[in-house]
């Protein structure tokens, strides 16, 4: 067949085994095996390129076949399979190249458009900053002396900070961590525990909570089911805090929040549907703890967290929602990034993008990381490489644009609504107090100290030594779980193929803990089996140790053993985000050989204690190991360098830099907390009518409050207003109203009249009606059925109602009155897709509704304002241009219902409008942060603040007014607006009304990046369904059932 000659030639070589290659030309592997075999050569080349274990199995079966004809047929079939695999890989490479080209063009276009708004005052100073890159990056001085540290401590002692860290997956506990037990319980677990412990010991920090998942499964230790665990401080920071100053709730704690299946330990890829449940549980803990701390250290004022720090994508997603719900700053550490993993998997060519998404939930993970970038004040990375080669893959971060925006902010110049998180490199810390490197080696006895004159060898030493026939040889140590990305098999190949290295050294592989290979995960067992086969293949018995078990307390002793033998630590991972084990090894006096991809580059730059290698080149790995093992002078120099510079990676150093970054970031907290009802304590209690009359005078005229454009229209008629500045007046007037409203805000004081609180605070149950669609299409009939289902409890007032919708308040008012409803039928109105919040007045003498004057300050974080609006208008015009010059405007601004925090647009043809993910991507590339929602059967689009939504509005009601989320029952249709998924999950009850949706609503979700099952678990006991027809009795029945769950 044409184009297949290369397959035929290989096939002929395999079937007709000829003389071997010259020794000088053949690889060391082939020379050691003896006679050259094209069969083996061909298969090895394919395995090297594709890592396809199935091909190797096919080859083994073909070799075992006795019949020549059958053998040849199998070999031929194998070659055709390889050819197909090669074609698939080529196709994936072409698709990847096209994707990269498209992204590069999008990025360049986004930069141009973002710069266009800022071009009129772009200065040479900004250009200099862009050119010099990091030269302007302020660098905090490192603490290199005890005096400097003591000075810093004295400055911090008066502070009493509350910090929240989040790390969801894996098994987390303070002592005897089971690192390596599975792929989720690795370096991140150790890092977050030690970070929490270190921060809890810092002056100025009162309490640190590390939030994680509570696991009450019989498959794991009981300790993971304990709600709270205090982290005992280490005596390693040198701080002399007086114990008398420590309060009742001070210190560092692991707090385990129950969410997801109560009796199962599940992998991180399966946690995504349960994130909303965690957020609600965490929100409850933080609010309650903030109140407790307020009583202890805040003079009765709530002490909110100074920051919420999410670790990895799942915790980042959670931290973003918590940050929005509480209005406090968020920090992010990615640890391992989804886009980078996707790139690596696509390069391997073994899986399609759909397969990758199904296996790793990669698109859900990437969107969580993008949202985390939207919400984060600071992104903490371990290395510059993580910023330059990994974070730059994301729509929400552009290093070039970030430098421009930072320069403008320093000069006090407008950024036109654009925001970019600050990337900060803070290497992880380590405890060094208990590390005492041995001075002796295995060739001579170590000098006995006075403190330990006859100290016995640790048991783990004997466990390792039993593998070796010559245990005194230098030990090459690798400590990593059996994961393909850790590249352990290449290390074993390098060791096995290099005879001089085998003669000089032993190899120790600490690959986590295991009982039986069959009990391991398929991936881990596959790696371990490959290692065992390679040991057998190269006959490495007596030269390689691979113990089955070790404790976390044994790890320092393993490092000491390797250093005692004058060995080398190696990390051959394809990519290492940081490389904490490299720092641990250096602290124990071990030189290193490490991958040149990732964090080890920065570690080597600081410590200068080893060599970097290409992890794909096994020859270079073998050469580097041999060089360090054979050259004792080089070994000694690397050891001394590592020990001399290791203090730069201490936990006090890390924590000081960490806290300094938080202090320099923009601080925010709930609006009512800062104002805290000034002056109320010195005033006489107001009567209900007086308290509401002040608010009425300012805002209870609905036509003025919600539709200030009428005022502008009047001014235009009088010739006093131009079109150019009308929008600016609207925004400033709206802000002025809300500032005035703050003077008449609801009081938090319990001794005030009950009428100052929204009515829903008195309810035993709250029905939230969030059914989407067209209000003229019978949706109000459903509202009546829900009212009827509440029955006498509605009349008695034990059940309250909240209407949650994409419509504006004037539209809702018109619809309600036209359908015979009263505005007092609902206690609250969540309008404009969650960007507006109103309450029913409790005094019949007053007007109907009251705006929550604190809500806008709660959701305005990173709101682009007029700069965002202008960009959206340009985007709308570009949609029309793409459809032809004669085409009518596809999408137009709806000024009638737009507000200061919701830009509304009319869509005339939804088939010509791209999905929401494309618009959000375009805005992110231009550093504009927003939440885009297609609503009202696709006829409207609302653009609101990035952390605002209808589900977040419910969390606000809990934080602001103490309304328990578990008391809420949210009613939704079978489908809804594009924010529909956020309403389903959480601790509240959800009732899905089957049949309440239409084709238009379903089409809004047709272009999702991931299925609904990656967002919410419809099997949750908090979710129930009512069959098509939705009778009042059925609704009442399902609510009763859910309440008992």
Swiss-Prot record:
Which keywords fit this entry according to its UniProt record? Glycosyltransferase, Transferase
Which intervals carry biased composition (Low complexity)? 664-674
Q: Which InterPro entries match?
A: Glyco_trans_1 (IPR001296), SPP-like_dom (IPR006380), SPS (IPR044161), SPS_C (IPR035659), SPS_pln (IPR012819), Sucrose_synth_GT-B1 (IPR000368)
Q: In which residue ranges is the amino acid composition biased (Basic and acidic residues)?
A: 93-115, 124-137
Cystine pairings recorded for this chain: none
Q: Where is this region: Disordered?
A: 93-141, 222-243, 662-692
What pathway, per the record? Glycan biosynthesis; sucrose biosynthesis; sucrose from D-fructose 6-phosphate and UDP-alpha-D-glucose: step 1/2
Q: List the expressing tissues.
A: Predominantly active in tap root.
Q: What reaction is this protein's catalytic activity?
A: beta-D-fructose 6-phosphate + UDP-alpha-D-glucose = sucrose 6(F)-phosphate + UDP + H(+)
Q: How is its activity regulated?
A: Activity is regulated by phosphorylation and moderated by concentration of metabolites and light.
Look up the coiled coil feature and give its residue ranges.
Answer: none
Q: State any GO BP term from the record.
A: sucrose biosynthetic process
- Per its record, what are the GO molecular function terms? sucrose-phosphate synthase activity
Record-listed E.C. numbers: 2.4.1.14
Assembly and oligomerization: Homodimer or homotetramer.
State the family named in the UniProt similarity comment for this chain. Answer: Belongs to the glycosyltransferase 1 family.
Q: What functional role does this protein have?
A: Plays a role in photosynthetic sucrose synthesis by catalyzing the rate-limiting step of sucrose biosynthesis from UDP-glucose and fructose- 6-phosphate. Involved in the regulation of carbon partitioning in the leaves of plants. May regulate the synthesis of sucrose and therefore play a major role as a limiting factor in the export of photoassimilates out of the leaf. Plays a role for sucrose availability that is essential for plant growth and fiber elongation.
The protein, known as: Probable sucrose-phosphate synthase
Q: Which gene encodes it?
A: SPS
């Amino acid at each position: 067949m044409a184009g297949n000659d290369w397959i035929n030639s290989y096939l002929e070589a395999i079937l007709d085994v000829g003389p071997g290659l010259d020794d000088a030309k053949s690889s060391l592997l082939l020379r050691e095996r003896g006679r050259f075999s094209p069969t083996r050569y061909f298969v090895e080349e394919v395995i090297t390129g594709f890592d396809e274990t199935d091909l190797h199995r096919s080859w083994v079966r073909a070799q075992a076949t006795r019949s020549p004809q059958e053998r040849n047929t199998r070999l031929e079939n194998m070659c055709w399979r390889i050819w197909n695999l090669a074609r698939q890989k080529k196709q994936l490479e072409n698709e990847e190249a096209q994707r990269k080209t498209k992204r590069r063009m999008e990025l360049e276009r986004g930069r141009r458009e973002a710069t266009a708004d800022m071009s009129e005052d772009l200065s040479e100073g900004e250009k200099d900053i862009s050119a010099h890159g990091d030269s302007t990056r302020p660098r905090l001085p490192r603490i290199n002396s005890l005096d400097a540290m003591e000075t810093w401590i004295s400055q911090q002692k008066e502070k009493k900070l509350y910090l929240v860290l989040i790390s969801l997956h894996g098994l987390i506990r303070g002592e005897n961590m089971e690192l390596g037990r599975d792929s989720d319980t690795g370096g991140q677990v150790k890092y977050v525990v030690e970070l929490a412990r270190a921060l809890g010991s810092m002056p100025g920090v009162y309490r640190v909570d590390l939030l994680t998942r509570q696991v009450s499964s019989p498959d794991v230790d009981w300790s993971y089911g304990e709600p709270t665990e205090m982290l005992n401080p280490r005596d390693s920071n040198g701080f002399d805090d007086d114990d008398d100053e420590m309060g009742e709730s001070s210190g560092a704690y692991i707090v385990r929040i129950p969410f997801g299946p109560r009796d199962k330990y599940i992998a991180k890829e399966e946690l995504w549907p349960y994130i909303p449940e965690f957020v609600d549980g965490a929100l409850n803990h933080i609010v309650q703890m903030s109140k407790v701390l307020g009583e202890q250290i805040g003079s009765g004022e709530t002490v909110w967290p100074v920051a919420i720090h999410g670790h990895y994508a799942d915790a980042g997603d959670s931290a973003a929602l918590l940050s929005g719900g509480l209005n406090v700053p968020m920090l992010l550490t990615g640890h391992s990034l989804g886009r980078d993993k996707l790139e690596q998997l696509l390069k391997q060519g073994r899986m399609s993008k759909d397969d990758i998404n199904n296996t790793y939930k990669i698109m859900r993970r990437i969107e969580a990381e993008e949202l985390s970038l939207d919400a984060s004040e600071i992104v903490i990375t371990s290395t510059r490489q993580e910023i330059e080669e990994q974070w730059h893959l994301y729509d929400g971060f552009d290093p070039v644009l970030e430098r421009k925006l930072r320069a403008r902010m320093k000069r006090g110049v407008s950024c036109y609504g654009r925001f970019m998180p600050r990337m900060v490199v803070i290497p992880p810390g380590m405890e060094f107090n208990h590390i005492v490197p041995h001075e002796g080696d295995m060739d001579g006895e170590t000098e006995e100290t006075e403190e330990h004159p006859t100290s016995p060898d640790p048991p783990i030493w004997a466990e390792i030594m039993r593998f070796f026939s010559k245990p005194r040889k230098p030990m090459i140590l690798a400590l990593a779980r059996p994961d393909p990305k850790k590249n352990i098999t290449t290390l074993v190949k390098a060791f096995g193929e290099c005879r001089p290295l085998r003669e000089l050294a032993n190899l120790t592989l600490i690959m986590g803990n295991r009982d039986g290979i069959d009990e391991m995960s398929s991936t881990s067992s596959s790696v371990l089996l490959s290692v065992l086969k390679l040991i057998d293949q190269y006959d490495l018995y007596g030269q390689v140790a691979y113990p089955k078990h070790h404790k976390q307390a044994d790890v320092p002793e393993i490092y000491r053993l390797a250093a005692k033998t004058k060995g080398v630590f190696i990390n051959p991972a394809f990519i290492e985000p940081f490389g904490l084990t490299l720092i641990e090894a250096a602290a124990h006096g071990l030189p290193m050989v490490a991958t040149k991809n990732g964090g080890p580059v920065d570690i080597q730059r600081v410590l200068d204690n080893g060599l970097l290698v290409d992890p794909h080149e096994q020859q270079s790995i073998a050469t580097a190991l041999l060089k360090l093992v054979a050259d004792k002078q080089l070994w000694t120099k690397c050891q001394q360098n590592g020990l001399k510079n290791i203090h730069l990676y201490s936990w006090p150093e890390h924590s000081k830099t960490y806290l300094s970054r938080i202090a320099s970031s923009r601080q925010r907290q709930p609006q009512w907390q800062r104002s805290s009802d000034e002056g109320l304590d010195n005033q006489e209690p107001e009567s209900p009518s007086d308290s509401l009359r002040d608010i009425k005078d300012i805002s209870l005229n609905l036509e003025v409050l919600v539709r200030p454009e009428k005022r502008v229209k009047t001014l235009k008629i009088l010739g006093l207003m131009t079109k150019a500045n009308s929008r600016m007046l609207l925004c400033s007037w709206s802000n002025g109203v809300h500032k005035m409203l703050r003077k008449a805000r609801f009081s938090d004081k319990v001794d005030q009249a009950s009428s100052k609180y929204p009515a829903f605070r008195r309810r035993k149950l709250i029905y939230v009606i969030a059914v989407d669609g067209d209000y003229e299409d019978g949706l109000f009939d459903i509202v009546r059925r829900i009212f009827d289902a509440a029955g006498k409890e509605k009349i008695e007032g034990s059940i309250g109602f909240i209407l949650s919708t994409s419509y504006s308040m004037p539209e809702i008012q018109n619809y309600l009155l036209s359908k015979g409803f009263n505005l007092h039928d609902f206690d609250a109105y969540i309008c404009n897709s969650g960007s507006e919040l109103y309450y029913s007045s409790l005094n019949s003498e007053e007007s109907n509704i009251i705006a929550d004057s604190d809500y806008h300050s709660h959701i305005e974080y990173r709101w682009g304002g007029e700069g965002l609006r202008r960009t959206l208008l340009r985007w709308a015009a570009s949609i029309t241009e793409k459809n032809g010059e004669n085409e009518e405007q596809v999408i137009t601004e709806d000024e009638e219902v737009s507000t200061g925090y919701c830009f509304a647009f009319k869509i005339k043809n939804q088939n010509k409008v791209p999905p929401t993910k494309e618009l959000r991507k375009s805005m992110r590339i231009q550093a504009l942060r927003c939440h885009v929602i297609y609503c009202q059967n696709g006829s409207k689009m609302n653009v609101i603040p990035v952390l605002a939504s209808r589900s977040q509005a419910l969390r606000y009601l809990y934080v602001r007014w103490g309304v328990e989320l578990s008391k809420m029952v949210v009613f939704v249709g079978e489908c809804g607006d594009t924010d529909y998924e956020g309403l389903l999950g959480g601790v509240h009850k959800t009732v899905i009304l089957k049949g309440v949706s239409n084709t238009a609503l379903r089409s809004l979700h047709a272009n999702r990046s991931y299925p609904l099952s990656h967002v919410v678990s419809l099997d949750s006991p908090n979710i129930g369904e009512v069959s098509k027809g939705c009778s009042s009795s059925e609704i009442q029945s399902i609510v009763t059932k859910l309440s008992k769950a």
